[in-house]
Structures are given as structure tokens and as C-alpha cells.
Amino acid sequence: MKKRIGIVGAGTAGLHLGLFLRQHDVDVTVYTDRKPDEYSGLRLLNTVAHNAVTVQREVALDVNEWPSEEFGYFGHYYYVGGPQPMRFYGDLKAPSRAVDYRLYQPMLMRALEARGGKFCYDAVSAEDLEGLSEQYDLLVVCTGKYALGKVFEKQSENSPFEKPQRALCVGLFKGIKEAPIRAVTMSFSPGHGELIEIPTLSFNGMSTALVLENHIGSDLEVLAHTKYDDDPRAFLDLMLEKLGKHHPSVAERIDPAEFDLANSSLDILQGGVVPAFRDGHATLNNGKTIIGLGDIQATVDPVLGQGANMASYAAWILGEEILAHSVYDLRFSEHLERRRQDRVLCATRWTNFTLSALSALPPEFLAFLQILSQSREMADEFTDNFNYPERQWDRFSSPERIGQWCSQFAPTIAA
């Protein structure tokens, strides 16, 4: 008998899972409250970049609509402010790519539907889960909307924050000249905030995503509260002022006369994210085990861009486990967690560590930045390992590990 899987939520996790399962002739129904043709009129959803490992999964799923060789980026520029600013670069072994999710998500939905996936366009609440679970061999929940996140218990030991750690101002902009190599820029203004600049394909071609991770109480926090719609010129002038003061490696490539939101006033998001890590399964009153996937399991701040990438990875692993098993109970969830948890948990821990380290600047982290800025080999390794957060956490999970990693590259600098 053909397996029947219900998926609640049409984000990257749910759609990648659905596409994987349809490749293996598994019956898939996706529940979402948004149709593909509604996306173009929405506010900016996020500023997600897909790492090379995620792009490879898209190739395998036959949804690599925008090849990275043409639309992608090839490394990271780094800028660390201070009395003696540091500028350096790290290569990616294979290009990564960012596409406006208002283009990307409807493309995935249409591809899934064309391959036999079914969609039910309706809101699903926590109260609906028990009834839905009776209709499928397995129900997978991939969205935290409508209090669905409360169904999965938060793990306090992996959820150290009770409030947002950054005041975010995120937008798609035009008028920013590309660097000599098309790349992400990660700029750090100690005590004030971080900026991640991402070359991004949007409605009118290539644009620039600016992810401003402003420290709460700092000179930059005002960017999270000043509204573009109230006075566009005043907002843009404020942005130019703050970028020039805190993130000069990006500001120096801006044409003030052209600088503006890329498409419309819908191209900006402001607010904050409360990071959380939850159990990856829940048992309903009817005894059915349901699986949490993507943001509903691991909600991370966007500072390292790990959310969609680990969601895609976890979706692939879940797909493989669905194919390998026929009973979807608590033991099934244990098999799943054994395989997906290292990457998902390490991405969460590395992100949370980075938020804290960039605020507190402990001596071992400052030493890491100093050596990173002087060792191209280390910068290349660090940059490419954005693909592999478990490798990053192997390096950052204790001061001793950071020190040991730095010691590998310090002699090459001295030489």
C-alpha cells in the first residue's frame, strides 16, 4: 500500500520533503494558507541564502531553477571594525545562492503540484492536528503558525534566550555596487551590531540584501524602529549615516543617489527573533506520533544564515527515514533524531554562541578573529564550513577547542 504523508506548512522544510517523497511515489498532501500566486504581493519573507550543500539537494530534486554559477556568490568578505580595522576574505569551495523567497517558494509549490503533490489551502491549528493525523501514515508539522509550536516542547538546555538578542532591520536594496568577487560581506561593529550583505535575485534582477543585526541599546538599534513608509528619504539618509559609521566596507560601494529599496516599500522587515530549540516529535492524545521539522524544531537568529539550510537537510533525512520505515511511532522518531540532530543542534548552538560572543567578545574569540584575519587558509576553512555547522561547532564549543584550532594556523602566520 502506498504511504500517505501529511505536511503542515509550505516553507523550505515542507516543500523539500514533499518533493523528495514524490520522487519515490509517496502520496503527499501539503496544508498551507497561502497560494503560489499570492507571494508576489507579500512583504519580504526573509533574506535566505542557500549554501552549496542545499543547492546540491535542489539539483537532486530537480528544482535548481537559478544555477549558482550564474546567480550565486563565491565567498565571504569580512570586516571587523575597531582602532585597527581588519579586512579579509574566505573562499567557498562551491558557490552558494540567494533568491527572494517570493520567487522561490511558489516555484517549489508549482513543481510539487506538477509532480503529483496535493495542496489543501487552509489554516491548520493545534486543535486540528489530531484529526489530520488520523488521515495519514505520518503527519509532519513545519510551521509555528497558529500556536502549532506549543505542541512541541521547548528544550530549555538548548534555548538559552527568552527574548530577541538583536533588533533586526532587513531589506532588499539597489544602488550597492558588487565587490570585485560576488560574495557575501560580513561586517562587525563591536558593541553595535553585525551586517550581512547578500547578493540576492529578486523580481527586477540582482539586488542586495542587507541584514542589520543591531545590538539592543546600541547606536544602531534605531534602524529597527525607524519606518521607511513614514519618510523614505529620512530612512535612507539614516541608513547611509549608520552604514558609513559602522560598516564602511559596504558603505563605500553605495551610490547615494541610487540607494533605495529594490522593488517597493514591501522590501523591508524589522523586528526580532527569539531563538528556540524544541523536541522533534510530539505524541497526540490519540497516541499518534507527529514530527516537527524546520523552524518549528529549531528557530535561529539569521546572523549565520543557518535556518533554511538545516531545514532542507532535515527534510532530506526525514524523507530517507520515511522510505526506510513503515511504522511511524516513537521509535521512528528516535531513528530520525539520531541522524538529523547533530547538524540541526550544532547549527543552533553555533548561532547562539556567535550572538553571545559578538556581544561579549571573550578573549578566545578575539584571538580567533585576529588569526582568522591573517590566515587565508583558516578563513577559507571557516567560510566553507558554513555548509557544515557541526564542523563549526567542533571548533567553537569550548575555549579549549577555539584555542586548539587557532594554534593550527598561528605557526603559518609567524612563518
UniProtKB/Swiss-Prot annotation:
InterPro entries membership: FAD/NAD-bd_sf, StyA_sbd, StyMonoxStyA
EC code: 1.14.14.11
Keyword set, alphabetical order: FAD, Flavoprotein, Monooxygenase, Oxidoreductase
Record-level Gene Ontology MF annotations: monooxygenase activity
Coiled-coil annotated spans: none
Xref: Gene3D superfamilies: 3.30.9.40, 6.10.250.650, FAD/NAD(P)-binding domain
A Pfam family reported for this protein in Swiss-Prot or TrEMBL: Smoa_sbd
Pathway field: Aromatic compound metabolism
Subunit structure: Homodimer. A direct interaction with the monooxygenase reductase component StyB seems not to be necessary for the enzymatic activity.
Protein role: Styrene monooxygenase which catalyzes the first step in the aerobic styrene degradation pathway by enantioselective epoxidation of the vinyl side chain. In a two-component system, a reductase utilizes NADH to reduce FAD, which is then transferred to the oxygenase; the electron transfer is proposed to occur via a diffusing flavin.
Family of this protein: Belongs to the StyA family.
Name of protein: Styrene monooxygenase StyA
Organism lineage: Bacteria, Pseudomonadati, Pseudomonadota, Gammaproteobacteria, Pseudomonadales
